[in-house]
């Protein structure tokens, strides 16, 4: 017999497996927050939902249901059913969900059954699954040891993390590199989507039973994405690994990240001329964002050097002069700030080393030597 209701006990399995999901909520609800494996194929669009909601408040549930049927009928109803069937043809194992796992899920399931498709819906809907994911974030720090990877700007922390199976890449989830120049071309996720994706990454990490959870030593805000407070507090108590890198390698890594990759990305998106203009604005606006912290004199020196580098790149197709302002940025801003912050938490430093030494240290790590007791 085909199951028509997926119980809340299967939330973990849904997210770990990346189960295809049909989100029946209106677009306005979906855009506030959803799940990575979901697609929005609403039962009612925004205006229809608004009318039904007003009717529910004024006349009650039965009147609202009747209005919903009158709004979504005939050709409109068939269009919605066809959209669901089209998705199910490509993803036959998909589940349905609405906000609470109530009327919208049940009605959609009924219409699909009449069309010849038996599709389960998720108990508790979006609200139940969202609350479950919040709980995952809150409880994870107590379930396994946390280690925080620190290192000067340009030391290659993200490059290192993505090579480690015990790591979760917070900046990748936030789509932001964490620094003043960390903005990417594509926008960051909504706060809710950031939290949902973080929780799912943590679930998958737990599934693999690693000896620890390795995270980058982040600020509370990664761009505009805020780490959940309890999770951030746990990170602030974690032992620290300091990734060390030679200055020339740091400079060239930042040249590649800030200049080569960003310029290429803007050009691919917008074309040569508009892409270069957008790239220039990205650099100049990033610098402007730290103007107060730099002070007027240092800001002007950096801006002038950056403008010269952009002019050389535009006229001679050379990027080497960008190293001048990147070097100034490290000397005048990033490095002093990092050294000050690390000094305050020096008592939490567990290990220092370059990429190779850090890999070897983590490879030799065992659950016994990294228990909650000797980390705390």
Swiss-Prot record:
**The Rhodanese domain covers which part of the protein?**
15-138
The membrane spanning regions, by residue number, are none
Cross-referenced InterPro entries, in alphabetical order? Rhodanese-like_dom, Rhodanese-like_dom_sf, SelU
GO biological process terms held by the UniProt record: tRNA wobble uridine modification
Q: What class of enzyme is it?
A: transferase
> What does the sequence similarity comment in the record state about its family?
Belongs to the SelU family.
Keywords of this entry: Selenium, Transferase
> What Gene3D superfamilies is this protein classified in?
Rhodanese-like domain
What positions constitute the catalytic site?
98 (s-selanylcysteine intermediate)
Gene Ontology MF annotations: transferase activity, transferring alkyl or aryl (other than methyl) groups; tRNA 2-selenouridine synthase activity
Q: Does the keyword Lipoprotein apply?
A: no
Transferase as a keyword of this entry, yes or no, is yes
- Catalyzed reactions per annotation: 5-methylaminomethyl-2-thiouridine(34) in tRNA + selenophosphate + (2E)-geranyl diphosphate + H2O + H(+) = 5-methylaminomethyl-2-selenouridine(34) in tRNA + (2E)-thiogeraniol + phosphate + diphosphate; 5-methylaminomethyl-2-thiouridine(34) in tRNA + (2E)-geranyl diphosphate = 5-methylaminomethyl-S-(2E)-geranyl-thiouridine(34) in tRNA + diphosphate; 5-methylaminomethyl-S-(2E)-geranyl-thiouridine(34) in tRNA + selenophosphate + H(+) = 5-methylaminomethyl-2-(Se-phospho)selenouridine(34) in tRNA + (2E)-thiogeraniol; 5-methylaminomethyl-2-(Se-phospho)selenouridine(34) in tRNA + H2O = 5-methylaminomethyl-2-selenouridine(34) in tRNA + phosphate
Function, as annotated, reads:
Involved in the post-transcriptional modification of the uridine at the wobble position (U34) of tRNA(Lys), tRNA(Glu) and tRNA(Gln). Catalyzes the conversion of 2-thiouridine (S2U-RNA) to 2-selenouridine (Se2U-RNA). Acts in a two-step process involving geranylation of 2-thiouridine (S2U) to S-geranyl-2-thiouridine (geS2U) and subsequent selenation of the latter derivative to 2-selenouridine (Se2U) in the tRNA chain.
- E.C. number, please? 2.9.1.3
Q: What is the name of this protein?
A: tRNA 2-selenouridine synthase
Extract the SMART domains matched here.
RHOD
Q: Name one Pfam family in it.
A: Rhodanese
* Description of how the protein assembles with itself and partners: Monomer.
